[in-house]
Curated annotation (Swiss-Prot):
<feature type="region of interest" description="Disordered">
    <location>
        <begin position="159"/>
        <end position="230"/>
    </location>
</feature>
<feature type="region of interest" description="Dimerization">
    <location>
        <begin position="267"/>
        <end position="384"/>
    </location>
</feature>
<comment type="similarity">
    <text>Belongs to the betacoronavirus nucleocapsid protein family.</text>
</comment>
<keyword id="KW-1040">Host Golgi apparatus</keyword>
<feature type="compositionally biased region" description="Basic residues">
    <location>
        <begin position="393"/>
        <end position="402"/>
    </location>
</feature>
<feature type="modified residue" description="Phosphoserine; by host">
    <location>
        <position position="194"/>
    </location>
</feature>
<feature type="modified residue" description="Phosphoserine; by host">
    <location>
        <position position="390"/>
    </location>
</feature>
<feature type="region of interest" description="Disordered">
    <location>
        <begin position="1"/>
        <end position="62"/>
    </location>
</feature>
<feature type="binding site">
    <location>
        <position position="109"/>
    </location>
    <ligand>
        <name>RNA</name>
    </ligand>
</feature>
<dbReference type="GO" id="GO:0044177">
    <property type="term" value="C:host cell Golgi apparatus"/>
</dbReference>
<feature type="modified residue" description="Phosphoserine; by host">
    <location>
        <position position="170"/>
    </location>
</feature>
<feature type="region of interest" description="Disordered">
    <location>
        <begin position="271"/>
        <end position="290"/>
    </location>
</feature>
<feature type="compositionally biased region" description="Low complexity">
    <location>
        <begin position="9"/>
        <end position="23"/>
    </location>
</feature>
<feature type="binding site">
    <location>
        <position position="167"/>
    </location>
    <ligand>
        <name>RNA</name>
    </ligand>
</feature>
<feature type="domain" description="CoV N NTD">
    <location>
        <begin position="64"/>
        <end position="193"/>
    </location>
</feature>
<dbReference type="InterPro" id="IPR044344">
    <property type="entry name" value="N_prot_C_CoV"/>
</dbReference>
<dbReference type="InterPro" id="IPR037195">
    <property type="entry name" value="Nucleocapsid_N"/>
</dbReference>
Amino acid sequence: MSFVPGQENAGSRSSSGNRAGNGILKKTTWADQTERGLNNQNRGRKNQPKQTATTQPNSGSVVPHYSWFSGITQFQKGKEFQFAQGQGVPIANGIPASQQKGYWYRHNRRSFKTPDGQQKQLLPRWYFYYLGTGPYAGAEYGDDIEGVVWVASQQAETRTSADIVERDPSSHEAIPTRFAPGTVLPQGFYVEGSGRSAPASRSGSRPQSRGPNNRARSSSNQRQPASTVKPDMAEEIAALVLAKLGKDAGQPKQVTKQSAKEVRQKILNKPRQKRTPNKQCPVQQCFGKRGPNQNFGGPEMLKLGTSDPQFPILAELAPTAGAFFFGSKLELVKKNSGGADGPTKDVYELQYSGAVRFDSTLPGFETIMKVLNENLNAYQNQDGGADVVSPKPQRKRGTKQKAQKDEVDNVSVAKPKSSVQRNVSRELTPEDRSLLAQILDDGVVPDGLEDDSNV
């Protein structure tokens, strides 16, 4: 028996007409391009689904490949679309774990011209197809295909195709993409309809009347009615506005030193138990160095904090506030109030101990175990023990001045070159007396020079 995603929720259709039979809100994307019913204005014409660029038939009427799920759109350049092993398959009611296997297909969207005449390429969007369906229905799991990312759950048998029927857009709406708890969405991507951005493709979201006059106007290359919304128009308008302002839509916001300092100070001003470490305020600035009492975090996670791509899956293990208070052993301990010069205040510590239990049936179990093993007691494997991240060497103040002073102190005073320079007294020799006698007119040596000379 073939499985139909969402069939467990199948029932009576909503009388308001805005819900599909599986209880999912109707939403049209590239994966669900079809015109709505035209009531009595279509004059008996049968409603035909739109063809996509990759499914245009060569001849005859071919049902295009419609994904069962909404797409995932890239919004940052240079990001890689990939999932951890055992993750990446959208969940849907009625699909067992053994059938959760398939691939994500990259849809390269068109480019448009900006007001300054440059071509702007829209970033691609990805759609999921079960194994044995979609554009690469004949491919085997794991084949090296450009623009294809293979995913499967741990319980799925990838050597056989999934027993999933092709989606008929006239009877089944696209299901908003959701993943099992613990799944890490690739950075730089968002799920269509998840609230990250307004849905970019809404073609066919309103019934359009296409009488003979409308067909003639379309064939004459005249302007389409203003109510027609082209695919990706929302993103195109946003890109045009940014181009007008001289900004790049794909350029991330730059963090300056001043803004990083403000973020760090804002985090450190919070109580210790309320701090959230990130790139601007790393783990060791928030909670101190790693050691026996704070033994979690490898070099990369200590640097990025909660911004680490592996952190969200660990957050699945974190207890709630209720579990913390009602599922732990708590003890209130009074601590010293501080120094004698400080203000008098009572200081307490709420000490706690507990455990989080999980088993191999937890979604993403293998990834969780891998991340835990890499970060538990990681400080022991680093040089310097608890100093996982070496502090930045600080320049000692006054070192240069002290060295200059020592150099001056070590310089010896130059000795006088002669006894005259040193002004040292000495007794005259006979040669001195003879020379003085020749100089003096009377030939007598003065008594003052007999024993001492300042010459």
